[in-house]
């Protein structure tokens, strides 16, 4: 078992939508620092799940290039603002959020009507400004996933009048790592891994490391007890399957086919008992027919008959 320590040497909160953590992992064997740092970085950035708005329906709006009377922002600006909203959620199912505000008012994410298992990380996140007594009404679909998803033109039957949004699901904004050599004792040199993580506030840097490590653990656990099938076993199964093929599959000429049938050769297994030399000994089976069979075997099944009979 690996013997090393991990310590958080710096931690801070940068507003409602930013957390930073710096961690030191030591002492690792030489080379393990890069291995662990690179694997953790890729896993944390690519595999962690987050929650984001994926589609929006605004009352009276048909496309993203529309404007809304009484609202300062056009629809495209509102969609960009919604893209920046960060959520916390453990629910894997799609959710619907709503908002209905009568102006004049400033619309923020804190006014969203959400289910109890979804939380807005920054309630002050700006969405739009209503300049008069206009009623601003909107529904939006929230999903949990990984990575980044571009707005899809093809929507499901439940979203016919929804506008699609480019969605950022990644809860971690940035990961850096650095490996330093440290001397342990008099002769031993080890690796020290320094890991820096910036999140969007939906998870802490500590949670990011834990979740990233869990992903890697589950990935590598499947490699611990692999059931390797021998090449010979595989070949035997394939040979058995091929040998059961009937000679009709070779699509031979009528003359060659009838000669084989009269010689009681009905399958590839029967044919493999013959060499090229023995084929010519079959009654009325000439050189041309033999060449036809040899070619068909090679082309159809990749099989070559031996030229001479082997004892």
Swiss-Prot record:
Residues 1-227 are annotated as: Alpha N-terminal domain (alpha-NTD). It catalyses: RNA(n) + a ribonucleoside 5'-triphosphate = RNA(n+1) + diphosphate. GO terms for cellular component: chloroplast; DNA-directed RNA polymerase complex; mitochondrion. Coiled coil: none annotated. Its main location: plastid. One of its GO terms (molecular function) is DNA-directed RNA polymerase activity. DNA-dependent RNA polymerase catalyzes the transcription of DNA into RNA using the four ribonucleoside triphosphates as substrates. Belongs to the RNA polymerase alpha chain family. HAMAP family: RNApol_bact_RpoA (MF_00059). This is DNA-directed RNA polymerase subunit alpha. The gene is rpoA.
């Amino acid at each position: 078992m690996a013997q090393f320590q991990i310590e958080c040497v710096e931690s801070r909160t940068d507003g409602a939508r930013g957390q930073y953590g710096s961690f030191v992992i030591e002492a690792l064997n030489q080379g393990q620092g890069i291995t662990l740092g690179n694997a953790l970085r890729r896993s944390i950035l690519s595999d962690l799940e987050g929650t984001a708005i994926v589609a929006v329906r605004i009352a009276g709006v048909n496309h993203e290039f529309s404007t809304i009377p009484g609202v300062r922002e056009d629809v495209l600006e509102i969609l960009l603002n919604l893209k920046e909203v960060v959520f916390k959620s453990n629910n894997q199912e799609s959710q619907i959020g709503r908002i209905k505000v009568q102006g004049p008012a400033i619309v923020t994410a804190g006014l969203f009507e959400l289910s109890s298992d979804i939380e807005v990380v920054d309630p002050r996140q700006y969405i739009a400004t209503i300049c008069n007594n206009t009623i601003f009404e909107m529904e939006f679909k929230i999903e949990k996933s990984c990575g980044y998803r571009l707005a899809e033109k093809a929507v499901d039957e439940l979203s016919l009048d929804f506008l699609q949004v480019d969605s950022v699901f990644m809860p971690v904004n940035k990961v850096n790592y650095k490996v330093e050599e440290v001397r342990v004792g008099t002769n031993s040199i080890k690796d020290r891994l320094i890991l820096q993580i910036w999140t969007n506030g939906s998870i802490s840097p500590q949670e990011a490391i834990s979740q990233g490590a869990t992903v890697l653990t589950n990935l590598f656990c499947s490699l611990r007890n692999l059931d390797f099938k021998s090449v010979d076993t595989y070949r035997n199964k394939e040979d058995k399957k091929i040998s059961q093929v009937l000679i009709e599959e070779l699509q031979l000429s009528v003359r060659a086919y009838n000669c084989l049938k009269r010689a009681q050769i009905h399958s590839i297994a029967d044919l493999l008992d013959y060499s090229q030399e023995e084929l010519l000994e079959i009654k009325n089976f000439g050189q041309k027919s033999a060449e036809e069979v040899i070619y068909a075997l090679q082309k159809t099944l990749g099989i070559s008959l031996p030229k001479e009979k082997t004892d």
